[in-house]
Swiss-Prot record:
GO cellular component entries: chromatin; nucleus; protein-containing complex
Polar residues bias (residue ranges): 128-152, 640-661
Organism of derivation: Schizosaccharomyces pombe (strain 972 / ATCC 24843)
Cleaved signal peptide residues: none
Coiled coil segments of this chain: none
The protein's name in its UniProt record: Transcription factor bye1
Region (Disordered) location: 93-209, 391-426, 636-661
Phylogenetic placement of the source organism: Eukaryota, Fungi, Dikarya, Ascomycota, Taphrinomycotina
Highest taxon above the source species: Eukaryota
GO MF term (any one): transcription elongation factor activity
Amino acid sequence: MVRKSTRRTAKASEKPPETVVRCVCKSQEDIGDTWVQCDGCDCWQHASCVGLADKDIPESYYCEVCHSRSDVSSQVQNSPNKDEEHQTADLLASNEGNEKNNEENNVVSSDSKEAITKESGAELESSEPASTNSNVGMTTRSGRQSPRTPIGSTTPKSSHSPPSTRKRRGSVGTTATHTKRSKNAPKTSPKDASNETADQEKELSLHTSIDEIQNPVRKSVAKAWVSVFEKIIEKAKLEGVQGLEDLNSTSLALQLEHIMFMVLSYTTDHSLTPNNKYREKFRALRFNLVDDKNPAFRARVLKNEISFNDLVNLSSEEMANPDLKNLAEEIRQQSTENTVIKQHLIAPRDRLLDEDKLTQQDELGIAENDDAMFPKPPGELVAPISIAEEEPTIDSKSPTLPEHNPLSEDDTSNGDKAAKRKGSFNDTKPIVNVPSIVEIDDPTILDIVEEEPLARNDSFSSPYSPAEDMAEESEFFGMKEKIWTGKVKMATVSEFHANALNLFGDVSASHLFEILSATALIEGRISVSSVLQYFHALRKTPSKEIIAVLFVPTEQNSQGFDILYDYFVKRNRYGVLHSKSNSVKDAYIIPMPSGNSVPELLDLLPKVDLPKDRNFQYFMGLFVLNKSSSRHESVERATPITTSTNGIPSTYQSASGTPTNPVHSYPSLESIINALTPSDMLLIKDVVENNPQIRANPSLAINPQFMQNAISAAQKKASKQ
């Protein structure tokens, strides 16, 4: 066996450190093979090039250079030549076994070795005998040829060495605790990797202080939880909750934040950066915990009746006030019962109609077998699907009455009697636009859950008490018309109760309720410069109309008002209001400071009458309306409907089947209400309460075309059941 000398010359000792990747194949490319790192010089080598299989990589490994420099073992010091011979034999034997499975076994002669040794020169003298662990023509797993033919041997001298010698290869010297293997090219040192692992383990553990949290998002959430727990603990004590003396807001905040991150973010993404689910759950939990309407939920969390692990998995419905949930469930059950009652009322109602038909036939002198005059009961009517139907039903008729009775023009006595009887069958049975003339003031489930005051179209009643300590500005408020009372709300931020005073512009109480409903919802925020630029352009647009109102909080020093006011002032932003009316193009809410200063936006508006010395802060609402749309809607609200919903002139089907001329009379409200049976009222109520489109947009309840289609769909659904 031929081996190199282990003597290091002065020239070799002065050689600069090797590169990070230094394999015996002289290649630094990553070909997808397994890499192994030396415990001595931290250089990386292909495992296949040094004769190691993937399953045989030891815990500690030393390259050929570091192995020759190791002088820890006394056995190596006493007989270095023998040890080198054993080590070389081990490498050759291991490499030979690996080559039998993957490649052909090639042998190089000693003459080839001497030729290569002369070419390598001083560099070859400073290398280790273990570097000759490959035979001539040996290729790596990727199939590439080694650029230099390593020195091999036909028969190792130490072939009698036991297998334990191979396992001990690379274990001389220091011992390592981790196997250094990598499927990719090495880029970081083991020290950096261990530091990253330690930092990751520290970040995933439960922290004892907020300063230990490295991620800025998690640190911000933890600080917010500290503030929330301090607030809700004080609220719970005022609400009479006992056993909260030992609670530590910081400890609770760190525990909840850690569980939120581990359950909602890290378990799913395996990343130290919180995901969107983590952020959304934080907003939902914070809103429900600080909600004054939900003290029961807050007390259960503080008394640990709901653990943090269960808390982060609760839905919005599970966190809601239990009283409101029970009330909503009762409403749903009542709606179901109403549907069943409506189905059972159909048969008795038919019998009543038969008796009524006989009575009216006697009075009007109509033959008993003439069924053409009597329309079907409202419970069986079907609304028209399209205008082009060949046989229009009575639903397509206009809600108008004929000026004269076409059935008995000669019989004056019967005609007078029919004129006096406004509740007669022929005068009232044709279907009318019930939602347009009947007030629908039953609260929906959404209104009950949110506890919003019910808005009515004909009158205005304030469910809240006015502010008491505004004597300084009472004269100004007395001069302004209060046109709205409700709640100003921005989700996840704050809300407060307020009255709206008309500053300028033509707007009525009913119109403002139509725009805002009972809650003025702030959808988002917008920069001040954008609003200024927009209103500056509106000055040159005559087709737009601007209405301004002043939102005055109904409770002095309202905490919700202060939070929302500071939210916009600190960010130098205006709010964007949600409008439910098509006539409103844009709507904004502007913070009004106290004192004499006013926002720059007021210079672009008509002269606004405000108190000279304002002692309090307010919000001003600005609504940009389309003049044509607002005028058209006001006309529609004031003028009765005299045409059908599809724009077809009103007609009435006579007994002979010939339609009469269009008429423009409108039935009285009393006659319409008398014409509706209990089942009709239940049907209308069921549609208004349970139709998802009406719940999303309540203004659809006064849309005749939509209500006709909705009632028709409900009738068809009930008939199939």
